Amino acid sequence: MKIVVMEPLGVKMEQINALAAPLQAAGHDFVYYTAKATDQTKLLARVQQADIIMLANQPLSAEIINACPNLKMLSVAFTGVDHIALAACRERGILVCNAAGYSTNAVAELTFGLAISVIRNIVPCDARCRQAGTKDGLVGFELFGKTFGVVGTGAIGSRVAKLAAAFGCRVLAYSRTPKAELQADGVRYVSLDELLAASDFVSLHVPLTDATRGLINAEAIAKMKPTAVLLNTARGPVVDSEALAQALNEGRLAGAGIDVFEGEPPIAPEHPLCHAKNTVLTPHVAFASAEALAARADIVFANIEQWLAGTPQNVIK
């Protein structure tokens, strides 16, 4: 079979070569691209004859999928798969597997990096030092003793809840599927409205679905404390950026730490959050630790090997 890795996976070629070696030894044709395709025509030229495509976060449209007559499997080096035309895959009987769990620690840790950056004024402090300034006006506040709301308690949300408790926070959670383990640790599951109203921090950890798109809109933001901080390391469209920026600029929300946007960075300079007060922005890097990238490469190659062996894993239903 022809296996095409249509974009780089962010790890050293030594790891790629080691992971590809068993597939090549079994007679499979393996192609690895070290840069993203710059347009859809070039992308199609890469993948059109593939039996298996491996990708990270570059969108894969129905048009591209349907133009690949031999395509049987996608191994996605990401947790979310909202950038892939899943309906087209289902219609064609193409198996889709993801890299479940690879970035749990990385995303959870950056969530708190963003939180602390916002509440302790890390970015303004850095600028002040470089400008030979003082600490005047840069008094922050602590995580300890605050109420930390976690929206979505999958693997990442659960890890965030445990870290919040370790910081001395009272932890609230909202999820369709409460976790007994978290409840045993003192996490209290509540309605989304109660979480929004009671939390000093609201941290988002839900996939992008029809139900979660625009979940945090103007109405939801209005239910939050004016002293609260919103954290989004999930998916950009879960939040209405215009409504969030307006609330921040009008003082109806204290701050925000945002890693994800409506599309992949670079984001336009005129994006509303680029001009919002008390906001720390990062260019979708929550997943991007060396450890996480190495782990996801292992997972997506294992997905292929397991499928070839007739025992697929990490299957997206």
Label for each model-derived stretch:
Residues 1-50, 172:
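N-terminal glycine-/charge-rich "phosphate-binding" loop or analogous flexible N-terminal tail
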Residues 7, 55-57, 78, 204-206, ...:
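Glycine-rich, N-terminal phosphate-binding loop of Rossmann-like dinucleotide-binding domains
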Residues 47, 68-71, 196:
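Structural signal for repeat-unit boundaries in curved repeat scaffolds
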Residues 62-65, 177-272:
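Rossmann-like adenosine-cofactor binding region
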Residues 92-94, 100-147, 159-162, 166, ...:
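Phosphate-binding beta-alpha-beta segment of Rossmann-like dinucleotide-binding domains, i.e.
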Residues 96-97, 227-317:
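Rossmann-like dinucleotide-binding domain for NAD(H)/NADP(H)
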Residues 153-154:
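Glycine-rich Rossmann-fold phosphate-binding loop(s) that bind the pyrophosphate
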